[in-house]
């Protein structure tokens, strides 16, 4: 049963399975991408932004003579590590750790297939070849802001990139790492598949939010548990389902999908959640940042009405 649920979670994001025409009854609105059709949206550069800048990682390890040797950890960008990223968007520790603790220890959305938390060092010239970047402690040498954090596979075609993006030798044969991953070119930084804008799971969570605002936690929990049961997560208890719980559940279900800032602003939780969970922006964010300033040009254009600027600007 666990494997069936695992495949159900993964299937939602595999190639050619986002649209209702493919039998996916969860999709509501899907953005269409065709990288081979210049008349279409050709790419969704999620990997470029969300995946860390791992390809230039350098580590120091001792060789057989006991000498410290500094080399790159990886041969380059690979399809097994979600393509080329530059680490523009790094999720918080709250996402990578906190939300998967109580009641979500067995949550398939956090499985090693959906969030890759460790990878093997694949450069044969490194004394650390074959060891694990995290388990064996090499990640401690790195810039954890951009160079390394877990890989979120839903945004990419992991181990299934279009062949046009493979690196090849002089005879046209694909180049691979010793561990079977295809080396890909630097422009391999997209999803190369259609992308959900809305799907049914979010609808359940929206209705759960409405029930919470009405004070009906039992119905809110029922909707939340419709989503959680598929992921093999423990059921939420009505007493614990509040707006913060729903925001955490949206993280678990919709990470790398929803426009998170819009959700937080809509709920009036932007400043609060940043102060609690984001050590970088939390130090400087103010309550008034929940609304953006109205452009002065728009205020000027409305000659028949007085438009007040949003507070704080």
Where would I find each of the regions flagged by the language model?
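Long, intrinsically disordered, low-complexity segments
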Residues: 2, 10-75, 164-168, 172-197, ...
